[in-house]
Swiss-Prot record:
It is an enzyme of class 2 (transferase). InterPro entries: Methyltr_RsmF_N, MeTrfase_RsmB-F_NOP2_cat, MeTrfase_RsmB-F_NOP2_dom, Nol1_Nop2_Fmu_2, Nop2p, RCMT, rRNA_ssu_MeTfrase_F, RsmB/NOL1/NOP2-like_CS. Specifically methylates the cytosine at position 1407 (m5C1407) of 16S rRNA. The gene is rsmF. PROSITE patterns: NOL1_NOP2_SUN, SAM_MT_RSMB_NOP. This is Ribosomal RNA small subunit methyltransferase F.
Length: 479
């Protein structure tokens, strides 16, 4: 790989020399930072198995190297530099994989280590969604996830990724993460706080990441991180697991934040060592059992991960003063819910007891049951999946529900050719050589549901959402 020139402030280099353990070479650190980052992907096991994915992509000649801490994660090498962007491949468009940096797969691995099986999880700083979607896959779309994002502009991206991956057990919120300790005390079995940080570990992806770096900025960020971890710890139930992570390298934003929590709450905080998380984890292990990943250790981004358990109750914070407002949804009555379920099944949409029907005016929604305890405590940006809109002639089934709930083996499923699938993703109607029989057609490609179409004569009317329509070169190679 070609080198690229990374900007390093002198004070940063001094700080890294002091922070780096004697077992590591500082020259190796500098050399690793100058190398471009290896690309990596994670197979979405909600949609396919790793074995089936490897078989499906074998003809492409990709070199996929397993990532030690994530069974479904791979570093990827491709022959041609001007190859089709990974985001334009059919497998990415249908949600079979997520483009995710290898080290960012570590926090979720830590969250579910040692057989941990949480039922209600919070991702405090969730956008763009790599870790939320990874958590959902580990939970197999069961239970419930509260995915919060403080930046309003990033909530839309977060939802798009959740929808593409076929995830149904997520509620989205748009809050400052510091409110949750007071708003939802002891409500979560597990919490991931991938904290906003100075980003010192991302220089391999962004050589100018340290242009605005300063020790003073680190201190300001660490102060915010302490407030965030304090809030998260209050929101964690007794016996629950909290994972704290950053993509930065200084001790102040990493070890010091965790040690501050321990000093504040003493025996209520138990550090859970991560030395056995994966083979070779001991290379990054600190004396407190955290993983401080310098980029030269595993040839990835710099990263920090700590796992802790709440072993004692702590004083409750004062209740928040904000008003949530009236919840605009109401549960669908059992009889009507049965009729809706039957109609949905006729077009290939099915769901289990983890989801419950709610309605708002003419909209029908499916909410994860595990999130209902939070209604009235927080204001949601989006909850579960929108199933349908009702109209005089029945139901207008929603694209996100098709991606999350449809079975490609349903009687109305119709497999498109690559050229037809590409037309579908471009938002155009499809004219198959042999028209399907059903009026409501479950459109599939590579045996994956990619939408629902109305058959009008020999034409399949495109219902692909306008905001998702793709231009340019796609997987058949035609622009």
């Amino acid at each position: 790989m070609a080198q690229h020139t990374v900007y390093f402030p002198d004070a940063f280099l001094t700080q890294m020399r002091e922070a780096m353990p004697s077992t590591l070479s500082f020259d190796d650190f500098l050399a690793a930072c100058q190398r471009p980052l290896r690309r990596s992907i994670r197979v979405n096991t909600l949609k396919t198995s790793v074995a089936d994915f490897l078989q499906l992509t074998a003809p492409y000649g990709w070199t996929l190297t397993p990532i030690p801490w994530c069974e479904e994660g791979f570093w990827i090498e491709r022959d041609s530099e001007d190859a089709l962007p990974l985001g334009s491949t059919a497998e990415h468009l249908s949600g079979l994989f997520y483009i995710q940096e290898a080290s960012s797969m570590l926090p979720v691995a830590a969250l579910f280590a040692d057989g941990n099986a949480p039922q209600r999880v919070m991702d405090v700083a969730a956008a763009p969604g790599s870790k939320t979607t990874q958590i959902a896959a580990r939970m197999n779309n069961k239970g419930a996830i509260l995915a919060n994002e403080f930046s309003a502009s990033r909530v839309k991206v977060l939802h798009a990724n959740i929808s593409r991956c076929g995830i149904s057990n997520v509620a989205l919120t748009h809050f400052d993460g510091r409110v949750f300790g007071a708003a939802v005390p002891e409500m979560f079995d597990a919490i991931l706080l991938d904290a906003p940080c100075s980003g010192e570990g991302v220089v391999r992806k962004d050589p100018d990441a340290l242009k605005n770096w300063s020790p003073e900025s680190n201190q300001e960020i660490a102060a915010t991180q302490r407030e965030l971890i304090d809030s998260a710890f209050h929101a964690l139930r007794l016996g629950g697991t909290l994972v704290y992570s950053t993509c930065t390298l200084n001790r102040e934003e990493n070890e010091a934040v965790c040690l501050w929590l321990k000093e504040t709450y003493h025996d209520a905080v138990e550090f859970l060592p991560l030395g056995d998380l994966f083979p070779g984890a001991n290379k990054a292990l600190t004396e407190d059992g955290f993983l401080h990943v310098f980029p030269q250790i595993y040839d990835c981004e710099g990263f920090f991960v700590a796992r802790l358990r709440k072993t004692q109750a702590i004083p409750v914070l004062p209740a928040p003063k904000y008003k949530v407002g009236n919840f605009p949804f109401s549960p669908v009555k059992d009889r009507e819910a049965g009729q809706i379920r039957q109609a949905a099944a006729s077009v290939g949409l099915n769901w289990d007891e983890n989801l419950r029907l709610w309605q708002r005016d003419k909209e029908l929604w499916l909410f994860p049951v595990g999130i209902e305890a939070l209604i009235g405590k927080v204001r949601f940006s989006r909850l579960g999946i929108k199933l349908a809109e009702t109209h005089n002639k029945g139901y207008r089934w929603q694209h996100e529900a098709v991606i999350a709930l449809a079975s490609p083996d349903n009687v109305n499923a119709f497999e498109l050719t690559p050229q037809e699938a590409e037309e579908w993703y471009r938002g155009r109607d499809v004219y198959p050589q042999a028209a399907p029989v059903a009026d409501d057609v479950l459109v599939t490609f590579q045996h994956q549901p990619i939408g629902l179409a109305k058959r009008i004569g020999s034409r399949l009317k495109n219902s692909y959402p306008r905001e998702l329509v793709r231009d340019g070169k796609l997987f058949t190679g035609n622009a």
